[in-house]
Amino acid sequence: MPEATEHPPIGEAQTEPAQSGCPMVIKPPVEGGSNRDWWPNAVNLKMLQKDPEVIDPMDEGYDYREAVQTLDVDQLARDFDELCTNSQDWWPADFGHYGPLFIRMSWHAAGTYRVQDGRGGAGKGMQRFAPLNSWPDNVSLDKARRLLWPLKKKYGKKLSWSDLIVYAGNRAMENMGFKTAGFAFGRPDYWEPEEDVYWGAEHEWLGSQDRYAGANGDRTKLENPLGASHMGLIYVNPEGPEGNPDPIAAAIDIRETFGRMAMNDVETAALIVGGHTFGKTHGATDIVNGPEPEAAPLEQMGLGWSNPGVGIDTVSSGLEVTWTHTPTKWDNSFLEILYGNEWELFKSPAGANQWRPKDNGWANSVPMAQGTGKTHPAMLTTDLSMRMDPIYGEITRRWLDHPEELAEEYAKAWFKLLHRDMGPVQRYLGPLVPTQTWLWQDIVPAGKPLSDADVATLKGAIADSGLTVQQLVSTAWKAASSFRISDMRGGANGGRIRLQPQLGWESNEPDELAQVISKLEEIQGSSGIDVSFADLVVLGGNVGIETAAKAAGFDIEVPFSSGRGDATQEQTDVEAFSYLEPKADGFRNYVGKGLNLPAEYQLIDQANLLNLSAPQMTVLIGGLRALGITHGDSKLGVLTDTPGQLTNDYFVNLTDMGVKWAPAPADDGTYVGTDRDTGEVKYTASRVDLLFGSNSQLRALAEVYAEDDSRDKFVKDFVAAWVNVMDADRYDIGKGA
């Protein structure tokens, strides 16, 4: 709503020279200063600090997902409905109803989701924190959250802010006559801003120059993984691209940005038409707002954008638009007005481009937000896109005559908007969860648990299959490492490694993968055991690790949780899953084409999306290298004379001062390790490998595993980290990351 090239998140340095002549402006730590002021190109390992208990104020043992199931949802709805029409003098309700404000709040919380990396969304309550709480597109949503405080205060630990922020918009629409598709609770609160989300390189609000750099005017060339056309907007500039009031050009931005939120044309049109059935925008005067919440004075107590105007004089986006004559009621009047008039451009009182009916059409048909006055309807440039763009126009013209279809599509799109980042349906809680499922939910049929005897039989069959340690471990890793904690998609459950698009990913080495799949399917069919392919893949990886450990002198059993299910190709959205394809996999020394950042940065981002800590990332790298798990069977980074054995050789040789490293003569980003005395070539390695010897923090971890008394610890820690990755998506048994 309007009030509103790959790049992993790396901190930006402050490079303006100080008056003293120092080339950096260094601040005390309490003001945000850090080592990164001096060394801005260092990898950001803070992304891998996984200890939420340190900042979580809840008591030990508190589980929000248990607490929310004791919530009286019916009473919450009654309390919310009463709050919606209880206008407060400090922030009066437009049209006597806070519902439209809450819809915008929910939309803007969920609408930050982007499909490329799964980040954003409402699932962690990030709208409460910087930078989102201070984005220019979120003006006045601080008031919306403050209005909800009585409900949050009353229900306490049973209701998270994360759930309440999106529930509010959902219930508001029901209160105003719309039948939603349902609602799922289950979003726990986080207690600090996410520092791992890249929102763009611009250093000013509403800037766009960096995200379209090199695009030569092609608005579809928005930098990945960004989902908005301007810094600080949820989607697009409602006045049109760069303020140009061209509805056709605006449609290009709309299609690109909504598509990056995983919405197709029908869903996009439904969200805009349905959402703009309610409420208004605010630009009643040319008053300039005060600073945003993060920059506001202490006495404003977390609120921002202060100005003398409230109620009818409120200024948020600077656009002054009321779309319909029934702004607190669900109906088809948005489309009736959009198609029932020809439109002319004019300026809002705040100077923003917007549209009104020609020839004073529909004058005095739209209520004022406060009082009893009347005015004319108005539209945004992006609203006119819903009529003038050929694709959107065909969709919305049909809805003009078939409003029941609009209602159905809006209900589905709204539910998707609010729940896209929640992961599998096993995470949906509460009495309002719909029984219907949709393709975008990545449904996995329930699997069957295996007995210990079944597991033993299958492990024997896998061990006798002729598949190598490298084939077994690599296939399990490829399947499980598709998981990302950001939106809890991917992983081994579902067995989609054998389906398109994963079967054809370059990173998955399709020809080699097909051979392994064929052999595992043969075992699945001949074993006489009702086992899923997904379970076999993970079990195969475990067999490979146990075999490699035994060869190194360690008799271990890798923990295994059975019960994974197998999805079908028909249950798999090929386009949606294509976004999970790794551009690089540092754990296997794979680097794809077209990356504009070095592989070590990609590794940190990948480890973060796998929900790994720095020690877990480190031990996994060392173990996989020792096993010879590399893309294309490369020897790059295999710093051992016994590949296929689970030893700590990788760390021993990486930290050996008898090995001298230098860039490879081919200047291809790889390195050659030679004997410091003889000059004999001993190993080759990648930038990822040398990171663990050059970065001071990672070297400290590597040294732990290189020590003579750490061989047992290395094996134990590797197995534990491996199991974490294999089970990262097991929300069906309460083990998910």
Swiss-Prot record:
Enumerate the active-site residues.
108 (proton acceptor)
* UniProt cross-references to Gene3D superfamilies, sorted A to Z: 1.10.520.10, Peroxidase, domain 2 (1.10.420.10)
Q: Say where the cross-link Tryptophyl-tyrosyl-methioninium (Tyr-Met) (with W-107) occurs.
A: 235-261
Question: Which residue stretches, if any, does this entry annotate as coiled coil?
Answer: none
GO molecular function terms noted in the UniProt entry: catalase activity; heme binding; metal ion binding
For this chain, the site of the Tryptophyl-tyrosyl-methioninium (Trp-Tyr) (with M-261) cross-link is 107-235
Q: What the entry says about post-translational processing?
A: Formation of the three residue Trp-Tyr-Met cross-link is important for the catalase, but not the peroxidase activity of the enzyme.
Q: Which Pfam families match?
A: peroxidase
Broad class of enzyme this protein falls into: oxidoreductase
Q: Where is this region: Disordered?
A: 1-33
Give the cofactors, semicolon-separated.
heme b
Which free-text remark accompanies the cofactor? Binds 1 heme b (iron(II)-protoporphyrin IX) group per dimer.
Is Cytoplasm given among the entry's keywords?
Answer: no
- Keywords (A to Z) from UniProt: Heme, Hydrogen peroxide, Iron, Metal-binding, Oxidoreductase, Peroxidase
Q: Which GO terms describe its cellular component?
A: cytosol
Sites binding heme sit at 276
Q: What is its EC number?
A: 1.11.1.21
Catalytic activity annotated for this protein?
A: H2O2 + AH2 = A + 2 H2O; 2 H2O2 = O2 + 2 H2O
Which biological process terms from the Gene Ontology are attached to this UniProt entry? cellular response to hydrogen peroxide; hydrogen peroxide catabolic process
At what residues does the UniProt record annotate the site feature described as Transition state stabilizer? Answer: 104
Q: Per its database record, what is this protein's job? A: Bifunctional enzyme with both catalase and broad-spectrum peroxidase activity.
Q: Which family does it belong to?
A: Belongs to the peroxidase family. Peroxidase/catalase subfamily.
The annotated subunit structure for this chain is: Homodimer or homotetramer.
**Annotated protein name in UniProt:** Catalase-peroxidase 2
Instruction: Give the originating organism.
Output: Mycolicibacterium vanbaalenii (strain DSM 7251 / JCM 13017 / BCRC 16820 / KCTC 9966 / NRRL B-24157 / PYR-1)
